[in-house]
């Protein structure tokens, strides 16, 4: 009875849907268009629900008939199967499906099973938390906590996964808010992360953030308002809230909860131990942390050639790959016959803003012992010669020079000469300042003359427009025009006088300097 009522209701709903679609195609009143569209959507949903209910009822009847046929004797089995087939075909016709051959149905079922298994595997890996590598733009390798969003293949066919980083420390690592919904319009040109494809072999176990180990003064990574995690230091802890001060001077101090703070990616370099065992443990931890170690000057010189390039295990290793393609064998020297150098070339830091010629000159000066001693050696004999000189005998010409120049009798001729040189330098500097001031005055006066000429041009145009119209306005314009012309004449005279002063100064310079 329930099956018949559902079938009748389904028939009624389909008839109503056809009427609504006919009304929409007929072009009804625009005010009723929205209501009809909503009614069509509701009827479609109602038909889908009724079909699913009818399908479940018929499945239950089919299962009950199968259970009943199992208890029947064996000779009557073909008749039971045929009746079941008839019911199944009637059921498929009722829901509007076409019957398929048995082989096709088996193939479809096996294909659907395989696809379901693949989907289950993808669903199993999706959402998994791991520790994934991240190669920064400056070439360093860091491991960050991440979440798997799907499985993909790398370019070389190797199995990989796409991950999104949970604690982004750069804008390029921050997940795009529209990527997971499939609404991002920028695709590869988006400035945010759409996930990074990582090989399965490069993944590491997820490391849970131990916030309990943080104390006042501990370094940490803190989440800013822009969603990026920046390096910071804890300054205060009070009732579950952490006050942090960011290392960047551009970011202000913030009060955050525990879920907005994590320990740094690698431990602080300041926390070290005096024991040798602790040092070895720290070295092992540094090797396992995924960061390249910086060797000191002493250790770099004693590094064995077989260990050279070992840091490339934590990077893409493009240098070693290029050398291997060119035929280089690890541990041997460079060159065709492996007779070249094995150790790396030491970098030489040159001063900024200096050319190679200047750097070579500086190195040669250092080797020669410097230039200052050479200059001092030159000055010494001159100073001794001046100090050891004897006072020349006075004559009548010295007496006349003293009286005419106003020089005291005890002053030496060399001292008067130096005083005259100082006075000449002061006069020369004063003349340079006065010349600069004259040049500035000439430029300002020329600019004022141009402004006054433009003003006279505007007044002449206004006067030409008002000819024969208003005598009062014309008289005012004529007065302003005559005043502007007088000011222009005065400015031109001032410019001529300044130019004369400039020429006089230039002539004086030519006459006094040889």
UniProtKB/Swiss-Prot annotation:
GO terms, molecular function: DNA-binding transcription factor activity; sequence-specific DNA binding; zinc ion binding
Compartments where found: Nucleus
GO biological process, one term: negative regulation of epidermal growth factor-activated receptor activity
The keyword Zinc-finger appears for this protein: yes
Signal peptide: none
Gene3D superfamilies assigned to the protein according to its UniProt record, in alphabetical order: 2.30.30.1190, 2.30.30.140
Biased composition (Basic residues): 365-383
Start-end of Acidic residues biased regions: 115-124, 272-287
Keywords: DNA-binding, Metal-binding, Nucleus, Repressor, Transcription, Transcription regulation, Zinc, Zinc-finger
Gene Ontology CC, one term: nucleus
CDD domains: Tudor_ZGPAT
Protein name per its UniProtKB record: Zinc finger CCCH-type with G patch domain-containing protein
Organism: Xenopus tropicalis
Phylogenetic placement of the source organism: Eukaryota, Metazoa, Chordata, Craniata, Vertebrata
Gene it is expressed from: zgpat
């Amino acid at each position: 009875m329930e099956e018949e009522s559902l079938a009748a209701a389904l028939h009624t709903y389909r008839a109503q849907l056809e009427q609504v679609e006919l009304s929409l195609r007929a072009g009804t009143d625009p005010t009723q268009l929205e209501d009809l569209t909503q009614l069509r959507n509701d009827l479609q949903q109602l038909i889908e629900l009724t079909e699913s209910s009818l399908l479940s009822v018929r499945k239950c009847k089919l299962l009950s008939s199968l259970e009943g046929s199992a208890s029947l004797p064996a000779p009557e089995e073909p008749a039971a199967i045929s009746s079941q087939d008839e019911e199944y075909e009637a059921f498929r016709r009722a829901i509007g499906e076409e019957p398929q051959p048995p082989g096709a149905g088996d193939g479809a079922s096996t294909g659907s099973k395989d696809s379901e298994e693949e989907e289950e595997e993808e669903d199993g890996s999706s959402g998994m938390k791991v520790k994934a590598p991240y190669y920064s733009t400056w070439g360093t390798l860091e491991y960050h906590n991440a979440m798997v969003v799907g499985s993909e293949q790398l370019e070389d066919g190797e199995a990989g996964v796409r991950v999104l980083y949970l604690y982004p420390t750069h804008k390029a690592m921050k997940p795009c808010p529209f990527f997971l919904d499939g609404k991002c319009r920028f695709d590869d040109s988006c400035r945010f992360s759409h996930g990074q494809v990582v090989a399965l072999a490069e993944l590491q176990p997820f490391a849970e953030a131990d916030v309990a180990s943080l104390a006042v003064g501990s370094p940490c990574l803190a989440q800013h308002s822009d969603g990026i995690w920046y390096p910071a230091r804890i300054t205060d802890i009070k009732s579950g809230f952490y006050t942090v001060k960011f290392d960047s001077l551009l970011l202000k101090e913030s009060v955050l909860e525990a879920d907005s703070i994590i320990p740094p990616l690698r431990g602080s370099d300041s926390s070290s131990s005096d024991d040798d065992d602790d040092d070895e443990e720290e070295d092992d931890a540094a090797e396992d942390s995924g960061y390249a170690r910086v060797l000191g000057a002493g250790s770099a010189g004693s590094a064995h050639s077989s260990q050279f390039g070992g840091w490339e295990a934590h990077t893409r290793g493009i240098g070693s790959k290029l050398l291997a393609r060119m035929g280089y064998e690890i541990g041997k020297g460079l060159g065709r016959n492996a007779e070249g150098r094995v150790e790396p070339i030491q970098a030489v830091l040159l001063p900024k803003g200096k050319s190679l010629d200047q750097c070579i000159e500086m190195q040669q000066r250092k080797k020669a012992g410097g230039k200052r001693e050479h200059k001092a050696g030159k000055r010494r004999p001159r100073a001794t010669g001046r100090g050891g000189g004897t006072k020349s005998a006075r004559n009548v010409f010295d007496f006349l020079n003293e009286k005419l120049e106003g020089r005291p009798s005890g002053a030496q001729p060399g001292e008067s000469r130096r005083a005259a040189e100082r006075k000449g330098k002061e006069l020369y500097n004063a003349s340079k300042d006065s010349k600069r001031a004259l040049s500035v005055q000439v430029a300002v006066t020329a600019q004022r003359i141009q402004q006054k000429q433009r003003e006279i041009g505007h007044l002449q145009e206004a006067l030409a427009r008002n000819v024969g119209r208003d005598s009062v306005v014309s008289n005012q314009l004529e007065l302003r025009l005559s005043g502007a012309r007088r000011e222009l004449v005065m400015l031109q005279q001032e410019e001529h006088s300044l130019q004369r002063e400039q020429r006089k100064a230039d002539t004086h310079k030519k006459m006094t300097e040889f």
